């Protein structure tokens, strides 16, 4: 949930700004000087909205717009083609996203949920917590577009990345419009930045009369320039992300494991034998981990495959086991240990007569320095008198052996997703002690936000929807293509209106259902 303190600060801050503005504008003594100050600085204030416009950058914009005219002509021609394709493709993309959302809503109905409580401990043998998990159908839902709500599906500690990426994407978008307008001989009045509640953005002020006088194709180059620049920025971000290991090679190396950068206070991985900042994880069970992608894939495999077992000799099994009374849990699994034990785990195995038995064993002694297995046959390769013991845990709970040498292995008992969400990692390991382990994470996270938000700005703005770039792209496109075919402007305008209406309804449906999906959970 959104922290109450954040809401109070935002609402309180805007209240102070608006009331101060109102008092100064109502004051007999300060009214004229205050309004003159606002006008001279290009500032305007309204409820939850502040806007700043300046002509300081006009010289720079004109310099960029008049440099290498032929190259810019080709550049914005590419942008025009991209914009038209993106406008029509956005219908397909929004339609697909809407269908995915509806399918997810059906999958997330009450009948599709299953939950189980899981406990874990990180004292002498494992890490401890309790929680519940839902059906896996919603975990693998990947959508190109998703509604983002700060504090709900956007972590509060990543708001800085989010808003910085939003501002940069907006500035690049408007720079595209500004340069294209100057290239097409449209007067450029100024550039500005605004803040709406907590969302920053940018804008350019163009002379409307000039825009109306130029040809539809010239208008298309201007209107498509913003989303074209956002698309290029996203591509550059992807390139930077791919080349990041090479760029940071003199200072950081990769490919040997993942480095722990943060462990949440409520993480089940916290404990005397848990994970610590600076630990290098090399394996999850028998799954080798060389980078972040391996870590995620290993956790996915562990989560969606049956619990793996461990080979143990008959003599060790006899030595460690003791008489137990097995009973069924509510989810149908079997328990045979004291519920309050932090070191013992219930294991199941088949004896030489293929009869399933259960025994309570000290987890660390039972699984330490043993090979993994699925059946007794996997253990016969090393010793004829060995059994494959499998932890008898609740439905979504797993026992995971986390190798982080030179420390002793961590034994984690719980849902793999809890390990995923409460432990922060990086693939970059510093070559020198004075280097920060957080720097690559900061750079990588910011670039990912920049790619996502710049790409999203390109897609959403291309939608033929009222008040978005897509509206003006569509109008200019219809003027350029249908004027010679349809002589009646009213018919052409009617076609444009229905396309805009369809795009607006489609976008509104995606946003509404997306918000409902995010906030209703």
From Swiss-Prot:
Species: Pongo abelii (Sumatran orangutan)
Keywords, comma-separated and alphabetical: Cholesterol metabolism, Cytoplasm, Glycoprotein, Golgi apparatus, Hydrolase, Lipid metabolism, Membrane, Metal-binding, Metalloprotease, Protease, Steroid metabolism, Sterol metabolism, Transmembrane, Transmembrane helix, Zinc
Residues in the Lumenal compartment per record: 25-74, 108-146, 254-448, 479-494
Statement: the UniProt record of this protein carries the keyword Transmembrane helix: yes
Predominant location category: membrane
Highest taxon of source: Eukaryota
Record function comment: Zinc metalloprotease that mediates intramembrane proteolysis of proteins such as ATF6, ATF6B, SREBF1/SREBP1 and SREBF2/SREBP2. Catalyzes the second step in the proteolytic activation of the sterol regulatory element-binding proteins (SREBPs) SREBF1/SREBP1 and SREBF2/SREBP2: cleaves SREBPs within the first transmembrane segment, thereby releasing the N-terminal segment with a portion of the transmembrane segment attached. Mature N-terminal SREBP fragments shuttle to the nucleus and activate gene transcription.
Protein's gene: MBTPS2
Gene3D superfamilies found in the cross-reference section: 2.30.42.10
Recorded family membership: Belongs to the peptidase M50A family.
Name of protein: Membrane-bound transcription factor site-2 protease
Binding-site list for Zn(2+): 173, 177
Phylogenetic lineage: Eukaryota, Metazoa, Chordata, Craniata, Vertebrata
